[in-house]
């Protein structure tokens, strides 16, 4: 489950509950693996990456508060110092959102003292191939690289938040860059997208004579897609790639396009509201741009 602030913690809690009531401790292994992975989704300020979600929390700011129950439970069961450290971090950064009073009343074992902290990772580069996502953390710098997502890159540094880098081309109405693949190669992260844009020719006389294009479905609509029946010509192709390289917490994005010439391109840098940009020119008649 890719929803980091809603459904992932719900699934963890459900598995823990079933494991306890049905005496099936093997179910906890999936919870452990999820909690270990989620450690690498946490920004320095305690917020969690939501860009990869397919649910309502996508691109929303969220804390780790809903994970508190799961991390505390497994920290106590396993004596896991990293899980205990993350519990204490949640207590510092997301205390107002923790809603675990009922759990402490029904499960007195949660009242036991947590194990001693073990260091949480603050310097890493992790590629999660199933999620087509890479996470890089260098101290106070935190970056996310994503395929299958209109946000291809996001970055945090202290209180500054570049919440999304996106780019699009004016290519047959389908030019919003959403990478098909994420390739990790020699310290670089390469996102790729391949597009085709055909021109559709009129139906042939034989196709019209058969009348297939005018057959109606029971609901009164055309039963066939006439565009799919039309011959294509002058098929245009556009290959787009973004290579992200990192050195000591500094990132370079190289965007390249090959194929159809003279295609307009727009690149968007979406910063979190509230900061102040310098060295830029405002876009006339466009708010916050």
Which role fits each region the language model picked out?
Residues 1-28:
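Aromatic-lined, polymer-binding surfaces characteristic
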Residues 25-289:
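Extended polysaccharide-engagement surfaces of secreted carbohydrate-active enzymes
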């Amino acid at each position: 489950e890719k929803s980091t602030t809603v459904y992932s913690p719900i699934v963890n809690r459900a598995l823990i509950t079933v494991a306890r009531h049905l005496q099936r401790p093997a179910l906890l292994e999936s919870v452990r693996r999820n909690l270990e992975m989620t450690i690498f989704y946490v920004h320095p300020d305690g917020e969690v990456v939501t860009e990869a979600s397919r649910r309502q929390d996508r691109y929303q700011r969220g804390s780790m508060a809903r994970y508190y129950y799961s991390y505390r439970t497994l920290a106590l069961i396993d004596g896991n110092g990293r899980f205990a450290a993350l519990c204490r971090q949640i207590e510092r950064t997301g205390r107002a959102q923790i809603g675990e009073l009922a759990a402490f009343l029904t499960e007195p074992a949660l009242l036991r003292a947590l194990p001693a902290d073990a260091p949480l990772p603050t310097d890493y580069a992790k590629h999660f191939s199933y999620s087509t996502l890479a996470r890089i953390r260098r101290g106070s710098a935190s970056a996310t690289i994503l395929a299958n997502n209109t946000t291809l890159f996001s970055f945090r540094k202290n209180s500054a938040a570049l919440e999304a880098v996106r780019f699009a081309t004016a290519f047959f109405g389908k030019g919003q860059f959403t990478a098909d693949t994420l390739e990790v190669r020699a310290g670089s992260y390469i996102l790729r997208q391949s597009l085709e844009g055909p021109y559709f020719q009129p139906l042939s006389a034989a196709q019209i004579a058969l009348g297939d294009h005018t057959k109606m479905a029971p609901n009164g609509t055309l039963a066939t897609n006439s565009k799919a029946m039309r011959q294509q010509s002058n098929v245009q192709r556009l290959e787009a790639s973004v290579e992200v390289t990192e050195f000591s917490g500094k990132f370079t994005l190289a965007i390249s396009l090959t194929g159809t010439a003279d295609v307009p391109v727009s690149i968007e840098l979406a910063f979190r509201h509230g900061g102040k940009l310098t060295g830029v020119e405002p876009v006339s008649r466009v708010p916050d741009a």
